[in-house]
């Protein structure tokens, strides 16, 4: 069954399609898991429908292969419980924020019609991350313009769609979060989704997957846990995920705030 899922994922979206409440976008497979998988799992447990869109296949990665990345991404998708995962197969390292790539992303945005999009950090150690963030924000805006015409896989004209919110998860370079989501109850599941990428992150059983990299050490996984603790502490919880937004957020009343014991 796993082989069938991977083959389906390589050629078409994994899982069922349809409108999503939340679409998480990452330029590389594993970006979403590292940045916002706890929030995805939380939202799904609260009855929301979520999906993942990978922009590239991560083919320039030093460890693993395209095939193993698909297998790992499919496993992580099942752990998170997302309804769909699709890969747009843009060129890792060389994609651009231009009309060609914007139109490709607009087709996906209009296909899934998400209310909320969560995507890469606005700037980061890896230049792909910031470029993907700008590509996503520009494409989300253009997707709402009626005169930007696109067609779906069947050749039918797509309707314009603009997500209500775009949020950016925090990656390697620390950004002070604009808001924080409590992921304490799902933290172990989040780490399980991250560790599904056995060729990318520390795994003593997978020592033959290529040279040691910045993210393949045990220290990197330790830093992921530490980051979640530090962010969670800011709102008085055990673990948190932080996000940045370019649009002001509002709440209906003060009861919506997380209580911090002092």
Where are each of the predicted segments found?
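Active-site rim/loop-helix segments in enzyme catalytic domains that contact anionic ligands
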Residues: 1-112, 244, 256-261
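Metal-dependent de-N-acetylase/amidase catalytic core
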Residues: 2-23, 99-262
